[in-house]
């Protein structure tokens, strides 16, 4: 299909995906890698299965990173050299956007004109580069923010650092320039409209998905045996980056009020959590619960599924969460979730049906929520487990890809109409 045919049929054949600050191939739970990485990789894989080629541009973070990594047929990751490989904080990345953009434009220049049909940027840093690429290549820009500075700053954990003003300015520019804006939930759409005055007609709600081939119910005792966890203890799992935003300390403080409960923490320090990488272990010691806290490094997807199967429940106490893939993945394994009633978590978790939503971060309230799930009668616990798995099964990456493609088609159609109007 030629480039002109793409705009005639509103059907993309090749997508340039921008993920400046973190590679989709990075292990979630380390550094800046999390749900966004999973989202970018899974949507790319599913687009490729439908015959749409995807090239993902990300910043190289090691000298050993090859310029091009072929993930599967139809999915390529391009590691763009922009700034030093190591020691560059995410907050310093705006200084390297020019270098990154130059690398993206050079890659496109090596192809025939009209190589990419659409640009999809993830996070505001990528949106800045996408804005330039959109104008240079004369193709539409679709943008997914994933998080917003104003939302994060309104719900900071104690002692956490606020997002800088330059990010708010940068996000506003991207919202103004993008042809379409993709959000995870209706709540996120309302935030874009109220904070950044986004045009509601340009917003598409696209729920993230879950890999139902990996995350599925399994035998709890077998899962615990595989991970070397006690067979006869109640287990509460926390999975994610160790940083104030994710509030792992709330899980420890709440569990300290529940004798006999084991806490499993899987993840690595990130963001402001890097300032005190041993902080959570020190807190466990201060609370006198070190003997019943198990720390695990970030886990592969199959191992993560095993951990979810092993746990009685999973806690997601984040101060801000645009969706909460961890909550969805846990439920896909039949494991109830106790989650903060923030952001997209009320969509990911059905309160009282697949888990519990907790208002605020009062430790006593969290202890009561965890205890309520752990002490539920066996029939009620089994019913909640079944409901959790059934709820998660409605969120597949195939459904996500359907909605994503619909947004791409709208972007191409509207861009084509606007371009013809300008030329008329």
Curated annotation (Swiss-Prot):
Q: Which family does it belong to?
A: Belongs to the glycosyltransferase group 1 family. MshA subfamily.
Q: Name the InterPro entries for this protein.
A: Glyco_trans_1, Glyco_trans_4-like_N, Mycothiol_biosynthesis_MshA
Q: Any idea which UniProt keywords this protein has?
A: Glycosyltransferase, Magnesium, Metal-binding, Transferase
What Pfam families does UniProt report for this protein, alphabetically? Glyco_trans_4_4, Glycos_transf_1
Q: Assembly and interactions?
A: Homodimer.
Q: Which residues bind 1D-myo-inositol 3-phosphate?
A: 21, 32-37, 90, 123, 147, 167
One molecular function GO term is: magnesium ion binding
Gene Ontology annotations of biological process type? mycothiol biosynthetic process
Keyword field contains Oxidoreductase: no
Task of the protein: Catalyzes the transfer of a N-acetyl-glucosamine moiety to 1D-myo-inositol 3-phosphate to produce 1D-myo-inositol 2-acetamido-2-deoxy-glucopyranoside 3-phosphate in the mycothiol biosynthesis pathway.
Organism's domain of life? Answer: Bacteria
- Specify the protein name: D-inositol 3-phosphate glycosyltransferase
| Keyword Glycosyltransferase set for record | yes
> Which residues make up the binding site for Mg(2+)?
308-309, 311, 335
Give the residues the record marks as binding UDP-N-acetyl-alpha-D-glucosamine.
Answer: 27-28, 35, 241, 246, 299, 321, 329
The record's listing under PANTHER family reads: D-INOSITOL 3-PHOSPHATE GLYCOSYLTRANSFERASE (PTHR12526:SF510), GLYCOSYLTRANSFERASE (PTHR12526)
EC no.? Answer: 2.4.1.250
Its catalytic activity?
1D-myo-inositol 3-phosphate + UDP-N-acetyl-alpha-D-glucosamine = 1D-myo-inositol 2-acetamido-2-deoxy-alpha-D-glucopyranoside 3-phosphate + UDP + H(+)
